[in-house]
Amino acid sequence: MAEEKALDFIQSNPTQDASAYSANYRAHKEGMTKEDVAEYYSKWADSGKYEEDLGPDRYNGPKYGAEALAQSYLDDRESIKILDIAAGTGFLGEELHKKGFRTIDGLDPAEGMLAIARKKNVYGRLVCEFMSDKRLPIENDTYDCVVIAGGMGEGHIPCVALHEMIRITKPGGLVVIVMREEYLDHVEEYKDRLEILMQELEDDGKWESISRVIVPKYSFDNNGIIFKYKVC
């Protein structure tokens, strides 16, 4: 289904948009391991094409992520400690900075992406690690908010990583996940699993749902979904 949709988009859109969509699709191809994904992103960043391919006319995930945080933190944004998971080249960090957030760390497994993010001077600490079931070099209850925009997909962040997100977030803090809506059905890792685990964690008193919102044109013409949870 995802491959057919990608082919249809590529064939029916202008060459530049089709090329960008194709590059993004190759980062989410079925069967990719997390190591494959990290290597692809590093090469994409090194080519100088990543930020052009996923500019604001094509990819709005960072704007949606920053706005979701801005709606929750109306005051004293400079002191809100945030971890941008799957930070990439710093798109979300830049959008958060525009909203007045100043205490932002980033995490991404692709060093080529982080090399670009580092130059933007919107992050404090940058950590080159995969987000998985492995314990990160981050203490419990470190962040007021952890946020992901674009880090969910084939070979990307697994469901089990939700536990680690909760561990590093302070009680009362937020976990915000912004992703393509169709991945809930098209990505085997998430199909009949991700939202079930989210509900199980709520039933177990680990967090509580604040909102679940569908948004248009998250990535190219695809809808996005924003999950917002409060850690207990």
Language-model segments: residues:
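Conserved beta-strand signature within the Rossmann-like core of class I S-adenosyl-L-methionine
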Residues: 172-180
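Conserved class I S-adenosyl-L-methionine
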Residues: 2-73
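A short glycine-rich, Lys/Arg-flanked "PGG" loop and its adjoining helix->strand segment in the class I
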Residues: 159-171
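Conserved Class I S-adenosyl-L-methionine
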Residues: 188-210
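Class I SAM-dependent methyltransferase SAM/SAH-binding core
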Residues: 83-135
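Residues lining the SAM
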Residues: 148-150, 178
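A short acidic, Gly/Pro-enriched loop at the edge of an enzyme's catalytic core
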Residues: 134-146
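Core SAM-dependent methyltransferase catalytic element
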Residues: 216-232
